[in-house]
Regions:
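C-type cytochrome heme c attachment motif
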Residues: 32-35, 47-50, 92-102
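Flexible inter-domain linker/hinge segments
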Residues: 1-49, 55-56, 63, 68-69, ...
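Generic long, charged, amphipathic alpha-helical segments
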Residues: 55, 59-86
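Iron-sulfur-cluster electron-transfer modules
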Residues: 77-158
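Cys/His-rich zinc-coordinating "finger/knuckle" motifs
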Residues: 40, 46, 55-58, 100-106, ...
């Protein structure tokens, strides 16, 4: 455990979707962030593009890890873990994995975000855009069939 984390530190457990064995659980993945702030680079490297654009701590890998850690450790109520506010903290993460390659602790915020989103959408509506992308194969088959006739008629009439 990181020296910055108090001995009495305990986390709320929940059913994890991904395999976090190497990280010693989801909490362990968050605890990899030791607060050094390499994710706050602005002049070189790719990490973290959303922080580089906003210069706001909450949009750095460290800020996101701290927010999630606060929710699962009891510093914030656990329901904050799947709140709209937490969604906004993670929303600008591009899932580019620069944090995993450039962070000295190899924090994988993309994987952390995927776990968060899975839990978030258990209690929130999945956006239409996400549903459409998840079902793009069905949409493509429709557009190649019925809709292609309609599109051809429209194109020929112009």
């Amino acid at each position: 455990m990181c020296a910055l984390i108090p001995q009495k530190y305990k986390t709320t457990t929940f059913e994890e979707t991904f395999d976090w064995t190497q990280e010693n659980g989801f909490a362990g993945a968050l605890e990899k962030c030791n607060g050094v702030g390499a994710c706050r680079k602005v002049k070189e490297g790719a990490m973290c593009p959303s922080y580089q654009a906003t210069l706001e701590e909450e949009h750095s890998t460290r800020g996101r890890a701290n927010a999630l850690r606060a929710a699962i450790s009891g510093s914030l109520p656990f329901n904050e873990f799947s709140s709209e506010r937490m969604y906004k903290v993670l929303d600008l993460c591009l899932e580019c994995k620069s944090c995993k390659s450039e962070c000295p602790s190899n924090v994988d915020m993309a994987k952390i975000k995927y776990e968060f989103l899975h839990n978030y959408y258990l209690s929130h509506k999945v956006p239409l855009r996400s549903k459409m992308i998840a079902n793009i194969h069905k949409i493509n088959s429709l557009s190649a069939g019925i809709f292609s006739v309609v599109v051809n008629i429209i194109v020929r009439s112009q």
